[in-house]
Amino acid sequence: MNRDFRPVRIFVLSATSFVFTAVVTLLAVIALAACAGNSTTASASRVAGKKPANKNMRAFATEDEMKAYFRKLAEERRREVERRSVTAGIAGEPAQDLAVNKAEAQPTSPAAKDDKESITNTQHAGVDEGGIVKLHGDHLVVLRRGRLFTVAIGDGALKPLSVVNAYGPEIDPRYTWYDEMLVSEDTVVVIGYSYERGGTEVGLFNIDRSGNLSYRSTYHLRSNDYYSSRNYASRLIGNKLIFYTPLYLNPYAADPSLEFPAVRKWHKGAKPEEFQRIVSATHVYRSERAINPDSGLALHTVTTCDLANGDFKCDATAVLGPPGRVFYVSPESVYVWTTEWSYYGPHRNEKSMVYRMPLDRDSPSALGVSGSPVDQFSFLESEDKHLNVLVRSNGSGDDMWSAERTAGDVALLRVPVSEFDDGTNDASSWDYHGLPKPRGYTFQNRFVGEYLLYGTGSGWGAPENKSESNLFVVNWRDGEVSQLKVNHGVDRIEALGSDAIVVGTDGSNLHFSSIRLADEPAVADEFVRKGASQGELRSHGFFYKPDGANSGVLGLPISVPGRSGYRHLFDESAAILFLRNDGLHFQEVGELTAQSERAVDDACRASCVDWYGNSRPLFIRGRIIAMLGYELVEGTMKNGQMQELRRVNYSPQAVKIARG
């Protein structure tokens, strides 16, 4: 058991206040390649500079070949350590070993349309993301504080039905975080991470037509913690569950493959030797570019499971690369961008690699790149078969809280997907378009339609007193940049139909700015909610329900003014605010509030911190429901104003009472 690594997320609880209110140290800046030119010249330059390469990456042919590869890496590492020791005159002092540090848009492409109504604010239509509330027939399914709940909503009802633990009956849930949940047909999947058992935990539950839940099975996957302050570890396309897990390897180990991802079905008395490797050598790919183990080594695994079978039969594909990573899923492919963890020398984070894993089971391909994306919203695989990525010169991925502390120059990488190969070639300098660098450190970005929007705000820290900041709007097809002034920081960017909305604080008040995305992008309107702050920071905390080409209603959790962003881990939102959008002009229609005085002790045993938040605006079949902790508050619109219709409590005690 990985007892040494239990405190990683737990330690953060005591350190969070200090970390997110401290002044962020300015990181060294590395210039990204940025050139502009006509497409003909760029294309010619790209072709002329390409080296001969295979179309896809090569997997190891045998276990022996893979082990020989690791032995070679280890030997090269030892020689490099000796060389540095002699050069520095400090022979015998070991080099820093980062490899064993286990501490822990609106889619432009025609995404597959989901016939079922979605209640999750996803990056791509048809690509669901692991969250805390989902819809199953006439029932809401909620994951909260280590338990699963169902609430009946059919025929106008709002009634708690069922509650079960989000883990097996014989599992000790201590030191385990149950973070994400997805629903496929009559299967509920819970994704968690266990420091006690050392890996990703996948729980399968049955849900029937009446909304009753029952436990089916649990599987453990050997991995490091997947947690990201912004990203989600799992996706669902149709019945296909896709989840990403990193595993940091020790290149000094005699056989690093002993640490490879493995799975076991949980039962009482389960032993470590029951783990069965799910990634054979013939499914481990590496690029032709040499890996520098001095900056860390990781196995990035994408596991795909067909939930239509009712079991946990999965295929896994893995790539070897640097440890820094960002995981992105488009309707067509899975992308993993890896960045070296190098903290010395003049070329920090200059070498990166992006891997493409098609969902049609074709072999992975790769491309050498520079810098690092901020998070999954830095990506767009567009319908013209290009990968568009915003990169910063000083970033290391979005694991844990890495996305909250990026810095450096900014560029837009736009490269044809056809340029990916076996990793021999790098993206051309013509593929990068230099962009203005905003002031500030908490960076937000989002692709909406044919535009990329970005800026900086307060994020997880204390609200900054910003009476004005820059919002940059980039046409990703031609690179034209518009610089807009907003009267607040940029803490959230969301699609508003074919336009956008930017949310941020001035230190005391919460601002909502609508952005018209046309030939000349512009700020169309601003609404100010005085004395408020965002109650949720994750993308799922927001939802916009259109009811016309240029109209609809949006919902966002709000809290008290001046609250630091990280407090959403501990505090429930005070209310969910609803605004009406009419041609990019906002009007408040009201809010649905929490009644915190009614809160009761839920006897929480597991996952007692809301890492993924606890409040959501829900628009379901013409109804509006605010999820505020254990409360579900339904509202109705009368004369353009929100009025509370009813509220229910779905806590464990309330479910018992409701069931009689």
Question: Where in the sequence are the language-model features?
Answer:
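Beta-sheet-rich non-transmembrane sensory/scaffold domains
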Residues: C35-G660
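N-terminal secretory signal peptides that target proteins for export/translocation
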Residues: M1-T16
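Bacterial N-terminal signal peptides
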Residues: S14-A33
